Amino acid sequence: MTFDKTIPKATIKRLSLYYRIFKRFHSENIEKASSKQIAEAIGIDSATVRRDFSYFGELGRRGFGYDVKKLMNFFADILNDTSTTNVLLVGVGNIGRALLNYRFHERNKMKIAMAFDTDDNEQVGQTTSDGIPIYGISSIKEKLIGTDVQTAILTVPSSKAQEVANILIDAGIKGILCFSPVHLSLPKGVVAQYVDLTSELQTLLYFMNQEQF
């Protein structure tokens, strides 16, 4: 299947939402869903749903709705959720520990396979209650040998983010989910997504203030 190469980032960011909604519809034994139903479930307008879906070819027929099981499988495929994706985590501070305790594999086919921190961190050498080993960062290349891990979650102080990113890239990591409020300098072939909790909270507060006027 050939997709439009100019898919907007806003559309791409909604793909996981569509996948989640179709999984929910499927669990509720809903076989067909209209663009209006999908839009209401996500909190957008139906025109946006139809426009988003148009980038991926013919996903449904006007007046007939969308086949829930078919679309659930479609989004699982393009989001690579048909087989388990192992990821690693660097930084076992407060955010890192919270993510280690979040059981991704129970909700999606993602699993934190190992975690890393500075070699002198007291947690190095330990294993979490879910069996995730914690290693010193200097051993990352060695630990990745023979694994399929190409994705990393980065939860380190901003001042260390680029340095650690360089270590990850040198070890063969191709994708980084960064919780540090900095923009990483990355070589071609390596991609990053950023989670800035402060920015998201400030945006929320802005919208809350707008509602008061």
Swiss-Prot record:
Pfam families: CoA_binding, Put_DNA-bind_N. Its main location: cytoplasm. The keyword Transcription regulation applies. Gene3D superfamilies: NAD(P)-binding Rossmann-like Domain, Winged helix-like DNA-binding domain superfamily/Winged helix DNA-binding domain. GO terms for cellular component: cytoplasm. Residues 17-56 bind DNA. Signal peptide: none annotated. Keywords: Cytoplasm, DNA-binding, NAD, Repressor, Transcription, Transcription regulation. It is found in: Cytoplasm. GO terms for molecular function: DNA binding; DNA-binding transcription factor activity. NAD(+) binds at G91, V92, G93, N94, I95, G96. GO terms for biological process: negative regulation of DNA-templated transcription; response to redox state. Homodimer. Belongs to the transcriptional regulatory Rex family. PANTHER family: REDOX-SENSING TRANSCRIPTIONAL REPRESSOR REX (PTHR35786), REDOX-SENSING TRANSCRIPTIONAL REPRESSOR REX 1 (PTHR35786:SF1). This is Redox-sensing transcriptional repressor Rex. The lineage of its organism: Bacteria, Bacillati, Bacillota, Bacilli, Lactobacillales. The gene is rex.
